[in-house]
Amino acid sequence: MRLHTAPLLLITALTAAAQQPAPVSASAQFQAIQSRLLASHAASDWLANLAAAQDQQALLNDDPAALLEVARAEVHIRDVHLNGDIAAIRELQQFVRMGQSTDFIEKTPDFATLRNRPEYADLQRDMAANRAPIALAATALVLPDANLLAEDIDVDTARHRFLITSVREHKIVAVSVTNSASAPAAITDFAPAPDPWPIVAIKIDRTRSRVWATESAMQGLSFSPKSDWGRTAVLCYDLRTGKLLRRVEGPHGSAFGDMLLLPNGDVIVSDGDGGGLYRLASNPASPDHLDRIDHGEFISPQTPALAPDGHRLFVPDYERGLAILDLTTQKVSWLAPQGRFALNGIDGLYCNRNQLIAVQNGTSPERVILFTLDAPLATIVSEKIIERATPTLGDPTHGVLIGRDFYYIANSGWDILDAHGNINSGAKPSQPRIMRATVPGPQPSTGSSPRQ
């Protein structure tokens, strides 16, 4: 589940976290840095602002928006640091190399001096290229219910159907895999949420005939009663009947938005609001206890993906990028963006041997992309965009890999909502569209290759 609060100072102001004790977790560090950015910006203390922006850049592993913060500060200190404009240009060039585009550089007065530099035309040209449509997927099916706010999807292979979660209608629906794309598909209700909350993540345990899902009364959003905001739970249904078998509530203030099913049937859920990763044993005889398996390294973890060795998780953090979590040692490391790969804003993530398929609704532009890793799965060597800037791509969320075909929700509907989950004035929900892209088989990855 994507981060629905604005992440960086470029977009919003943060609450006064600076009065809190010295930060330990990544979330606390992030809040403290944001407070420094806000205070130094208000005081026009650009040297302090640059220091805070660089700390944020380091914490967020070269998140593209963090690069813009650094560039802005560098422009403002050009009278103190004569190379400020040149340094800012370098940050913006890296932003563009990462496949990003923004009108912020053109519209804000902060970058006015850069617009007179010879490099600016190249930046504009390259950002325009980054906005060019790419369409390697085709429509697989269209759901007739435009009010679903479809979030996650998995496949029940035995019954040839997709199960799809609905945020707005608080349920899981079923739709046949064999539906034609030429007409809206027939959908049926699989199971309701036990509470008046959105159902968010879903994973099907075909071996044990179970459906795992999460429900979440998301803070500040109109989809749930205000009295329930901050509550969340893991759910388990019978795959055949849709009967609710288990409900395990998470810590208050959490939002279980994404999920991974392990081969032994255990479930990993991520808390995009509180920054935690939790493991729930599948054995019904086990206590309904959620074990936290991280140590505060994450700000907003999203959909984990299991590496082929079965011992490591790829964990996308909406803010910090792509992490690798060792399930045995719980040690966390981060994939390097290498100045050219944007790894932030990933909502759905799926592993296919040495490939990672990512649904990025937090990049600019939003996109569905395939990353190829080296043999040890420690370094990204190339990327291939599946879909970007097309009429069918609204706000993509999650997908499922069936053989070499990747099916994904292309236009969930989040992009027409305001900060409280209400439909923007004049906007009209569209029918959810499931796209299908054939993913190339894993390729040898012994060397580096350019962006594709």
Language-model features: locations:
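Helix-turn-helix repeat elements of alpha-solenoid scaffolds
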Residues: A39-A51, G84
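A short beta-strand motif characteristic of beta-propeller blades
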Residues: A137-P144, S182-P192, K243-E249, P287-G296, ...
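TPR/TPR-like alpha-solenoid helical repeat scaffolds
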Residues: A73-V75, S101-M127
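Beta-strand-rich domains and repeat architectures in extracellular enzymes and scaffolds
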Residues: R131-A135, T139-V173, S430-P432
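Short loop/turn segments immediately following the C-termini of beta-strands
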Residues: V167, S216-M218, G272-G274, S282, ...
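Short, conserved, GDST-rich strand-edge loop motifs in beta-rich repeat architectures
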Residues: A213-G230, N411-Q431
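Beta-rich, blade/repeat-based domains predominating
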Residues: P144-H160, V167, A193-R208, T214-Q219, ...
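Short loop/turn segments that connect beta-strands within beta-propeller blades
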Residues: S176-A181, D238-K243, A281-S286, D326-Q330, ...
